[in-house]
Amino acid sequence: MESVEEKSKQRRWLPNFKALRLKVYRLADRLNIPLADAARVELEEYDGSDPQSLRGLQKLPRTLYFGLPLPDSELDDTGEAKRWFPRNKIRTAKYTPIDFIPKNIFLQFQNVANLFFLFLVILQSISIFGEQVNPGLAAVPLIVVVGITAVKDAIEDFRRTMLDIHLNNTPTLRLSHYQNPNIRTEYISYFRRFKKRISALFRVFLAKQEEKKRAKRLNDAVPLEDMAGSESRPSYDSIFRESFEAKRSFEDSKGKVPLSALDGTATILQSRPMDIIDYEAEATGECHFKKTYWKDVRVGDFVKVMDNDEIPADIVIINSSDPEGICYIETKNLDGETNLKMRHALTCGKNVVDEASCERCRFWIESEPPHANLYEYNGACKSFVHSEAGGSDTSQTVSEPISLDSMLLRGCVLRNTKWVIGVVVFTGDDTKIMLNSGAPPLKRSRITRNLNWNVYLNFIILFSMCFVCAVVEGIAWRGHSRSSYYFEFGSIGGSPAKDGVVTFFTGVILFQNLVPISLYISIEIVKTIQAIFIYFDKDMYYKKLKYACTPKSWNISDDLGQVEYIFSDKTGTLTQNVMEFKKCTINGVAYGEAFTEAMAGMAKREGKDTEELTLQKQSFIERDRMQMISQMRNMHDNKYLVDDNLTFISSQFVHDLAGKAGEEQSLACYEFFLALALCHSVVADRVGDRIVYKAQSPDEAALVGTARDVGFVFLDQRRDIMVTRALGETQRFKLMDTIEFSSARKRMSVIVKGPDNRYVLICKGADSIIFERLEPNEQVELRKTTSEHLRIFALEGLRTLCIAKRELTEEEYYEWKEKYDIAASAIENREEQIEEVADLIESHLTLLGGTAIEDRLQEGVPDSIALLAQAGIKLWVLTGDKMETAINIGFSCNLLDAGMDMIKFDVDQEVSTPELEVILADYLYRYFGLSGSVEELEAAKKDHDTPSGSHALVIDGSVLKRVLDGPMRTKFLLLCKRCKAVLCCRVSPAQKADVVQLVRESLEVMTLAIGDGANDVAMIQKADIGVGIVGEEGRAAAMSADYAIGQFRFLSKLVLVHGRWDYNRVAEMVNNFFYKSVVWTFTLFWYQIYNNFDANYLFDYTYVMLFNLIFSSLPVIVMGVYDQDVNADLSLRIPQLYKRGILQLNSARKIFIGYMLDGFYQSVICFFFSFLVINNVTTAAQNGRDTMAVQDLGVYVAAPTIMVVDTYVILNQSNWDVFSIGLWALSCLTFWFWTGVYSQSLYTYEFYKSASRIFRTPNFWAVLCGTIVSCLFPKFLFMTTQKLFWPYDVDIIRESYRTKRLHELDEEEEIENAEQSPDWASSTLQVPFNASSSSLATPKKEPLRLDTNSLTLTSSMPRSFTPSYTPSFLEGSPVFSDEILNRGEYMPHRGSISSSEQPLRP
């Protein structure tokens, strides 16, 4: 029987032999290669499918021991810890220097096109198939494409590798010589030892080099005054240098922290029942906080983080330099939020202040398994408490719950705190930042997905051509009536059937260009440059945050031009998310004066003069504000009030607070605002004489800030003591417990103990949540009055909350507290257990009142929504606000108008599901005459028009949940499809994602979701395109999105300009790419007619190799990057041009087939024109050689073919300027240059000096010109006819722009605007009302409206100009004038007539 030592030794050697084998098993499993049963079992054991495996244990809750030995249940048979924890060394790079080449090549050849071309290279290396071609030369195109991609991947990965190295070698403080029982004995393989030696030598070498550089810098020192203002960006070399210098500095100091680092430590207090220090244990004195690298930190280690240092791993806070155990962190690296957040140390660790106390700690932590939720952590810290009772020493286990409030996550930065001592619970890939760093859902653009169909079609054509060649060639060899039977040495294969097979594969090699090898890399290059253009668009740069529109996914820019549905959050997306407390209701009395944007919108709909009404309201509010401030100053001197920042205006409130309306109302006002000053989680920060509140929610900051302004000031919080000053009187409340807010609970509660020793629970939340928790049969009239006030507030566009309280006895509290502590200490399902316990105490509440907060619209939102609607895009708003609030915001932002028929889908919970389905069916039939059948849904998929009616649907979240979960999805979707606007209110993040998924999958349309908060991430990732706004709630949405912008108004240009351009560019580019491949390949096919279809080359092989790679790629790439039919201004002024993208007219398959047929026709001309002309003429060079040799014929055919292809591409471009024409000329010249230079080489054999012979003959130039004209004239004639008699919308707009008619329209509009009365302001496209200004904002230039019914170009404002078009739009205006080319103006748009789009007729 093996000893424990032998087993331990065997286990240490185990990784050395199994590591490689397991990697092979994993690779085979990913490739779906069947594994043997033994291999499958071994893989599952070490990969975690088996719960008892090393990695499987990692997925279970973990228990970590500190100063205590591991129990037997945590040990294996060798005495080692069962658990395996990942190293803290992380790697975000895809490759290492060793595996880059094989891994990158393996990933690239997962692309089917690359595999196909690799197959061709292998075929050509076999002499029977590729005897005419050098295999090395045949591999050049594939090597170039793979090489370019590899270089691009290497550049991208190099940066990640450098950042990984820098991060892993960041120094931190770890308790050295501490016996950590949680870590298994680590086996270091020979390879890792080798790497460590190499790294050590590398560091020594760099250190010596740095010493030389430092000495040289000292010798060549520059005076300080000469260096003033000089600043350089850090390089990777400087990053390494700083890392190695830091290492040397702390190694020179033996890694010990100087005593000065412990200045300001917390005073050691007397031991209490919950204390993790064993004061009877003796410290060895060998443990010190020694500097080490992040990569060496392990689970179970004590670490010490200093001020402004980054957190190396996920750690539980044991103590901090603050006497109350408070520390502050910045979480910008995790969620993008820059405001500081407060964290609290465990109360049981308040005496842990130095190395000795850490060494004497005796406790264990029960932790949940690692997961990616950044906002949740459940754990418990437990230890033994010894007590002497009845003369015997007994031990009792005590516990303290651990939540996220006591955690520091890797990536956060410690701020405003001298030091923090903590213990590591998660390292490396188990940390939350790494679990959240996984790649977002892979999104491929629609054109890219549809590209497979084009490729498959070309494969079918390719194999058909090869099959024809194989059959005909086999038949030809079988017959004896041809001269080849007598002059050839026999068939290659030995029989007609084998000859056919050989010819088939030789044909695959010959016609390979039909599947363009450079297509995918060209598309990737084009989309990368398009993303760069988007990023550098100054019109989408948000100056306030210094943030440009940032593409995160570079491969879906063309999808932006096909969006049909936009799903938008409201708060922070349409609004500013800057909350202003405007009104409140207290004890049935409403307070506050305000004139909101929604109120202005209602006045406008009622036909009132909003300008005059605004002046009246503002004048009244200003007088009331001055009166209120004067009354408050007389009541008490509030030094924290800044007069200009006061948003809650109500002199009546101060009057009632002073008791002039009775003692009852005065007490109610006092309790209401004192509750606001206590029920929160904000941090008070003193800035001079002012107090500024930092909160995770802008609503909470507004509530506490208004309480401060009216005299109820929250001063500070130390541990569990909240200090307030109410009307000048300082009070201290003990915070007993906080029940946090969550999106599921929709409420928050605190329990405080007042100066009079009374226990009070204060609860704030949504009105529907609070009202159902009030004391039954109490405050009946107050409930009705408050509900009416809240309804009015919501109609005014304000966000509402309710405040309530409950007084508790000490017995009630501690009875509940016992249950709450059990729930709070639970490792699993803690949230659900806390919710159950919270329901016990958050009941029988007494209503105090309600608040109303205004969230103003962002600048430009109404204009942007109007533009998107005119473009044919449907906008749905998904918000968590009340229905009334959402409706009024909808009116304010032009989503709704007074003429709409509102369908409010809000029913009681008592209504059963069958009854709800009847109601939904009634709505659908009554308004639209539909039954909700599957056939109607299929018809709806093909209908992309804007709903013709004037209906708007508003649905509540509770009803929406039942609709989405039941069989009513089809009826609901049809109802929404027929409505011009849809508002979903009171919805959860999951419901937002479900709505997006329903529309996207059921209607098969392009969807875009836009939001600004973490609750929008699910919706953003579910949509085809996700757009995140960098806002007040952090950058969680922006980090998860495909595009990040600063304001909603930038969305209109992103979609209507860049999206439309990129869609047109990519669609046209793909069609032209396949067109040129067809032209080139079929010229080779026609040659086979005169060659027994034996798959011989017409061209020199270099032509075949370079055609798609060099000769014809540049014009197509320029088209994909640079082309635009109209400029950005016209794209925004005439948003109806966007509808072609929604209908996918430019990427329709019939358009693709048209290009293929055009290429087929041109291939006939290119080959037969040259062949038939030359075949009937005998020509000879000066040396007497007949120039009709096959290589010379190849030049005769290749030259016009390449010229035709390049000219055809630029003819399809809409925008001609010096740049595009220059690149077109460069592409053409490469052919002439290559032919002239390459044919001078002796190694070209029969091709030797072909250029010098052929280019001297006039026949060649006659054939060249004739072929180009014959190929392109039908296309030019078709384009001219289409634009003259069946012009598209864009053709009319471009012609109007060219003939200055749009400029004349602008001038007439300006004249009419000056003469126009204010009545026109009722237009839905007017500039949004700004209540803060003294008058209505000046209207901007109106977008043009293209009326396709009357087929005239009209403006949205009254005018007398209506252009009429003669049969010749371009009469008297040359198409290709030098002036236009020099200015880079736009050429008339090319296109083809589509039956799906009704062309505009004169």
UniProtKB/Swiss-Prot annotation:
Residues that coordinate or bind Mg(2+): 569, 571, 1012, 1016
CDD domains linked to this entry: P-type_ATPase_APLT_Dnf-like
GO cellular component, one term: endoplasmic reticulum membrane
Family matches, as Pfam families: Cation_ATPase, PhoLip_ATPase_C, PhoLip_ATPase_N
GO molecular function: ATP binding; ATP hydrolysis activity; ATPase-coupled intramembrane lipid transporter activity; glycosylceramide flippase activity; magnesium ion binding; phosphatidylcholine flippase activity; phosphatidylcholine floppase activity; phosphatidylethanolamine flippase activity
Domain of life of the source: Eukaryota
Major localization listed first in the record, in broad terms: membrane
Active-site residues (renumbered): 569
Matches recorded under Gene3D superfamilies: Calcium-transporting ATPase, cytoplasmic domain N, Calcium-transporting ATPase, cytoplasmic transduction domain A, HAD superfamily/HAD-like
Top-level EC class: translocase
Protein's membrane topology: Multi-pass membrane protein
Reaction(s) catalysed (UniProt annotation): ATP + H2O + phospholipidSide 1 = ADP + phosphate + phospholipidSide 2; a 1,2-diacyl-sn-glycero-3-phosphoethanolamine(out) + ATP + H2O = a 1,2-diacyl-sn-glycero-3-phosphoethanolamine(in) + ADP + phosphate + H(+); a 1,2-diacyl-sn-glycero-3-phosphocholine(out) + ATP + H2O = a 1,2-diacyl-sn-glycero-3-phosphocholine(in) + ADP + phosphate + H(+); a beta-D-glucosyl-(1<->1')-N-acylsphing-4-enine(out) + ATP + H2O = a beta-D-glucosyl-(1<->1')-N-acylsphing-4-enine(in) + ADP + phosphate + H(+)
Keywords: ATP-binding, Cell membrane, Endoplasmic reticulum, Lipid transport, Magnesium, Membrane, Metal-binding, Nucleotide-binding, Phosphoprotein, Translocase, Transmembrane, Transmembrane helix, Transport
Example GO biological process: phospholipid translocation
Transmembrane segments: 109-129, 135-155, 457-477, 501-521, 1066-1086, 1101-1121, 1151-1171, 1193-1213, 1218-1238, 1260-1280
Residues reported in the UniProt entry to bind ATP: 569-571, 700, 741, 743, 746, 764, 799-800, 879-881, 986, 992, 1015-1016
Key word Translocase present: yes
Subcellular location: Cell membrane; Endoplasmic reticulum membrane
Residues annotated as site: Involved in the release of the transported lipid into the cytosolic leaflet: 517
Cofactor(s) this protein requires: Mg(2+)
PANTHER family: PHOSPHOLIPID-TRANSPORTING ATPASE DNF1-RELATED, PROBABLE PHOSPHOLIPID-TRANSPORTING ATPASE
UniProt similarity note: Belongs to the cation transport ATPase (P-type) (TC 3.A.3) family. Type IV subfamily.
Entry protein name: Phospholipid-transporting ATPase dnf2
